Amino acid sequence: NPKINDFVASNPSFTNLHPLQPAESMQGALEVYYKTAKYLAEITGMDEFTLNPYAGAHGELVGLMIMKEYHYRRGDYKRTKVIVPDSAHGTNPASVNVAGMEVLEVASNPDGTVNIEDLKAVLSDEVAGIMLTNPNTLGIFEKDILAIKELARQYGALLYYDGANLNALLGITRPGDMGFDIVHLNLHKTFSTPHGGGGPGSGPVGVKKELAELLPNPRVVYEDGKYQIKYLPTAIGQISNFFGNFLVVLRAYTYILTLGKENLKYVGKLAVLNANYIKESLKDYYQVAVPGLCKHEVVFSGLKSKAVSTLDVAKRLLDYGYHPPTIYFPLIVHEALMVEPPETESKEILDGFIETMKTIAKEAIENPELLKTAPHNTVVRRLDEATAARKPILKYQDIINN
């Protein structure tokens, strides 16, 4: 999270605004909204964007609502199914269910890419769309994306892009150029906004022009030499209070302007370089889930020494001062450990992480119990996560009573 983002976002000219002010008195904020939407459209190859969703999963739901409404207005009421790969992020099928549609799971190849034959078997005139992440959750580019696009067109389905892995594509290609009709982004994944703590977040949704009228209200437009707020009757409705999380959008806008068009194109290349540097450095210690070139993230399938689990490795990383990477996802990878270095990490930082991972691999062989009882240097040691998940204590009074 670049400090310049927080410097701009803490400016009283922005923090003292109220969304019920007259539009004439907040032209600067409306300009940020308008231009951020235009920048995101250019970056992704979409035609229009809404910045109103509060987070990535919220954006997912909005995109699916647009998909559903598009078919409904065409009188195509039987399109109630959405195809989701078995390697997808868990929010994909969850969002489909919340949107009132049915999930059709399609099998993946060993590298996580969509099995085309399996896809053909589930396509029909009841399918509303296909949800894909590209690169997929194993960090592998969906090489058959153009063939998938043609199949979607053939059956009248829309193509939906989960933007969680957009980092790998910046400056190289765009979802719109691959044939995607709807895109949702996670500003914390690609545009340097705060990542943790449960929010606030932002999950902008972009669409091709055929779907633009469905984007939720309110809209920010530029007409008659000024920025205006409009509520269009063709929209799917209003999906958030006012304009979403403005200060998060402002941080992303700052990041885009700071890098500029010339430097944004290096984001994808550096993210891919960093991930492959880690993969090549650790492949003799940890099993690589998919051999060969990965994109912005590398997925390992546990240690080559089987004495300890991926969970043990993650817990031991805490002792060395590292926040553990994602573990046990994707679900189709046994003992998965996903490392996703951003484009901003220096070689020195990457080398420090690599050496720590090598040290842990050696500890697993020489003293596996050290890992199985980790962490040792944190205030709270290993938690009983299974009980915590099954019997959560969510109220302070329950803690007192126990």
Where are these regions (language model features)?
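Non-catalytic terminal extensions of PLP-dependent enzymes
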Residues: N1-D47, M65, E223, Q228, ...
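Conserved PLP-enzyme active-site core in the AAT-like
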Residues: G28-E31, H58-K226, T234, V308, ...
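A short glycine/serine-rich beta->alpha loop
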Residues: M46-Y54, T190-S192, A235-N241
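General small-molecule cofactor/ligand-binding pocket signal
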Residues: T50, L104-V106, P325
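Catalytic-loop motifs flanking and including active-site residues across diverse enzymes
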Residues: G59, G199, G244-R251, C294
